[in-house]
Amino acid sequence: MRRDAWIARLTPHRAALASLFLLVFPLFMPFKAIAVNILIQGLFALGFNLLYGYLGLLSFGHAALLGGGAYACGIVIVRFGMPWWIGIASGTLAGMLVAAGIGALAIRTRGIYFAMVTLALAQCLYFVAYQAVDWTGGENGLRGVNVAGISLLGVHLDIVRPLVRYYFVAAFVIAALFVLSRILASPFGAAMEAIRENETRARACGYDIAASRWLAFVLSGGFCGLAGALQAIHLGIVPVETLYYTTSGLAVMMTLLGGMGTFFGPFIGAGVFLLLEEVVSLWTVHWQLLVGAVFVACVLFFPRGLWGTLLAGHAR
């Protein structure tokens, strides 16, 4: 069997294979806190990759989607005393609502103009959060997002324990992977790829370009909002920097490291970036310079990303 045919046969099962890897990942990853961060940041990059990798829209405003979800979850839990599951649902919904608002204003622009509009709107949300001290904590962040124990189907889960917390987060990430797989396998997934490859031809085929872009942005916001909610529960705090433009840059970096337009690439990129950050920061306070150099080298020598290059090698 040709390798490309073998990969094609595995594609319908990619969500199951990715989920299996995430389930066994803690067995050979000794640092469980980093493993949880990889899950959350990978989910954030996955949301960005849906828009950039599969539709070709470069956004510099995805920090607003992550931060919107994180703040919504934190406010619901801290200010209103709601249970964790309402916090997570609120965070996911908030990410979609923020994306709907930003997308409605940005989707009719193109290229660098689209990126700049998303950046500007995201920075507006950052300054709103910075000033709304009573709700967001301002520059000190929203503290007290404490979820120590969770009762699920009569079973008490102590998510203070690192391994339990990992699988708690992994359950939502795995669900997101299956949702993404269904989206990509649907007619809408085919429409996204058609628009990315040739917008003029896609319009001639009857696709509503603006509506498709807006819907993709909203779906991307759902994944990012979920990541933000999980991050708020994991950290117990929502730093205002979550909304800052540098957070959007991390999504871009992790996606390009792993492989733009690949299913599991965002998690590979998140793992490489976070492990590099953890190791290099032990050696020098200038770790960002070295990690940036590694990123540039990867982009130059592996333009398809690490995971994308591996898949391309198997397809030959």
Region roles according to the model:
Residues 63, 88, 213-301:
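Transmembrane alpha-helical segments in multi-pass inner-membrane proteins
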Residues 23, 41-42, 70-71, 92-96, ...:
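Residue-level recognition of pore/gate-forming positions within transmembrane alpha-helices
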Residues 1-21, 141, 195-200, 204-212, ...:
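Cytosolic-side transmembrane-helix boundaries in multi-pass membrane proteins
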Residues 26-79, 105-114, 118, 194-195, ...:
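Single transmembrane alpha-helix segments in multi-pass membrane proteins
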Residues 121-158, 189, 307-309:
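Extracellular/periplasmic helix-loop junction at the C-terminal end of a transmembrane helix
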Residues 80-123, 268-270:
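Alpha-helical transmembrane segments within multi-pass membrane transporters and channels
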Residues 1-43, 72, 79-87, 161-163, ...:
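Membrane-interfacial amphipathic/re-entrant helices at transmembrane-helix boundaries
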Residues 160-239:
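Helix-loop-helix "hairpin" substructures at the membrane interface of multi-pass membrane proteins
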